[in-house]
Curated annotation (Swiss-Prot):
Pfam families named among the record's database cross-references: Glyco_tran_28_C, Glyco_transf_28
PANTHER family xref list: GLYCOSYLTRANSFERASE, UDP-N-ACETYLGLUCOSAMINE--N-ACETYLMURAMYL-(PENTAPEPTIDE) PYROPHOSPHORYL-UNDECAPRENOL N-ACETYLGLUCOSAMINE TRANSFERASE 1
Pathway membership, UniProt: Cell wall biogenesis; peptidoglycan biosynthesis
Start and end residues of each stretch annotated as Disordered: 364-383
Gene Ontology annotations of biological process type: carbohydrate metabolic process; cell division; cell wall organization; lipid glycosylation; peptidoglycan biosynthetic process; regulation of cell shape
Protein name: UDP-N-acetylglucosamine--N-acetylmuramyl-(pentapeptide) pyrophosphoryl-undecaprenol N-acetylglucosamine transferase
Binding site for UDP-N-acetyl-alpha-D-glucosamine: 10-12, 124, 165, 190, 245, 290
Transmembrane region(s): none
Function: Cell wall formation. Catalyzes the transfer of a GlcNAc subunit on undecaprenyl-pyrophosphoryl-MurNAc-pentapeptide (lipid intermediate I) to form undecaprenyl-pyrophosphoryl-MurNAc-(pentapeptide)GlcNAc (lipid intermediate II).
Reaction it catalyzes: di-trans,octa-cis-undecaprenyl diphospho-N-acetyl-alpha-D-muramoyl-L-alanyl-D-glutamyl-meso-2,6-diaminopimeloyl-D-alanyl-D-alanine + UDP-N-acetyl-alpha-D-glucosamine = di-trans,octa-cis-undecaprenyl diphospho-[N-acetyl-alpha-D-glucosaminyl-(1->4)]-N-acetyl-alpha-D-muramoyl-L-alanyl-D-glutamyl-meso-2,6-diaminopimeloyl-D-alanyl-D-alanine + UDP + H(+)
Domain of life: Bacteria
Lineage, uppermost ranks: Bacteria, Pseudomonadati, Myxococcota, Myxococcia, Myxococcales
């Protein structure tokens, strides 16, 4: 089976696609996966690093661009559809899965027009605009939250959760090494979160008595690293401050409490890894979907939510202290998180995709092609 994964832009779209791709290629040596994204998106760097080929198209978003910006970006759409058609003709995928983001629209629509089975994977509680539009033509809509189902025809919905990267799953299944000091993990997504970084530094004076009893790992993003390091040192803390955490599995395995945003992929990782959390939803997220995402964990007793408008150093310090000082509460939160986890999401989504392929092509392995046959890359893909 050859799968094409279209979309990206942010880690929340890209990483579930990579997790699904990892599941597909491990099933059979003849299976392969190709991604389609944009040069500006995170996918342009992380997909090749994960070992998968990627093709690029030229497309930009329409929402929130204003009338002039939307019109200019509309002019790119015919070119994006032509590029998508050429890519689909070369790769001849058996199924195309859109994971959200600008690139998924032209690719999935073109695949549908070419009678290739299509699906979308919606990570959030409120479906994104692109996935809502594509939901009208795709064969399947994979969701992670019950609230997202209302955006799609009931017959198309498979509520299976968000796929988690294989490396995170494998590393987390190893026994954790014992550690005496409470460990706090702070991160704001792949780019960091400026407001969250600032509030953590403001919280430190209120946690001064814990400086010898707590270990902190803090992903800041490139912009704030130097300032955050100075802030910790000024308050007598000796944390592990990084611009970016390459091995999130090790970071999760070594912590007792997580302070982070409420992106859907992050929450999927928290639940599979059974980690208590303090969630600070990103206030500018489309349709305020991070608040909706976070509420699912809060209502289950797995997390505490502080909206950014209410976030101060003192408030954050109080929540951190209350959770770290209460091992039994942490254990209850961890169990609650685990009950929400979907460790089999990638496997179950791949199962449905193989069934779509079987219905269309008569075999779960898809169209007949020579073993290992891949298209030659043209000199100018964007032409």
């Amino acid at each position: 089976m050859r799968m094409m994964v279209a979309g990206g832009g942010t880690g929340g779209h890209v990483f579930p696609g990579i997790a699904l791709a990892e599941e597909v290629v491990t099933r059979h040596p003849a299976n392969d996966v190709v991604f389609v994204g944009t040069a500006r998106g995170l996918e342009a760097s992380v997909v090749p690093a994960a070992g998968f080929p990627i093709e690029l198209i030229e497309v930009k978003g329409l929402k929130g661009k204003g009338i002039a910006g939307a019109l200019l970006n509309l002019l790119l759409l015919p070119r994006a559809f032509l590029q998508s058609w050429r890519i689909l003709k070369r790769w001849r995928p058996d199924v195309v899965v859109g994971v959200g983001g600008y690139a998924s629209g032209p690719v999935v629509l073109t695949a549908w027009a070419m009678r290739i089975p299509t699906a979308v994977q919606e990570q959030n509680a409120i479906a994104g605009l692109t996935n809502r539009l594509l939901g009208r033509v795709v064969k399947a809509a994979f969701t992670a939250f019950p609230e997202a189902a209302r955006h799609f025809a009931a017959r198309k919905v498979y509520q299976l959760g968000n796929p988690i990267r294989r490396r995170l799953m494998e590393n987390y299944m190893r026994p954790e090494s014992a550690h005496g000091q409470p460990r706090l993990l702070v991160f704001g997504g792949s780019q960091g979160a400026h407001a969250l970084n600032m509030r953590v530094i403001e919280a430190l004076p209120h946690l001064a008595d814990l400086r010898e009893r707590i270990q902190i790992t803090h992903q800041t993003g490139a912009r704030d690293r130097e300032y955050v390091e100075k802030g910790y040192r000024a308050c007598g803390f000796t944390p592990d401050v990084r611009e970016f955490i390459d091995d999130m599995s090790a970071a999760y395995a070594g912590c007792d409490l997580v302070v982070c945003r409420a992106g859907a992929t992050t929450l999927a990782e928290l639940t599979v890894c059974k980690k208590p959390s303090i969630l600070v939803p990103f206030p500018a997220a489309a349709d305020n979907h991070q608040v909706k995402n976070a509420r699912s964990l809060v209502d289950a007793g797995a997390a505490v939510m502080i909206e950014e408008r209410d976030l101060t150093g003192e408030v954050l310090a109080r929540e951190i202290r209350e959770i770290l000082d209460a091992p039994e509460r942490r254990e209850r939160m961890a169990r609650a998180a685990g009950r929400l986890g979907s460790p089999q999401a990638a496997k179950e989504i791949a199962d449905v995709c193989m069934e779509l392929v079987r219905r269309r092509w008569g075999s779960p392995f898809g169209q007949a092609r020579e073993p290992g046959q891949k298209p030659a890359r043209p000199p100018d893909l964007a032409s």
